[in-house]
């Protein structure tokens, strides 16, 4: 699979962490659902699995894959 590069360094496969805890999490399922924000801890590392329109990023965490805005994420220190 070819990585999709963006201006802020986010691409499929990049590891990220939450910069700010959202009020809720939106699943990246074909029919999205809202889930409580405490499913992902602020220091948990996730992996970008998809780039969506309107600055949304699909990120896989331990307890699911969620749609998050780019402003809510920062690159993980490796």
Name the predicted role of every residue range.
Residues 2-78:
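Basic/aromatic-rich interaction segments and small domains that mediate binding to polyanionic partners
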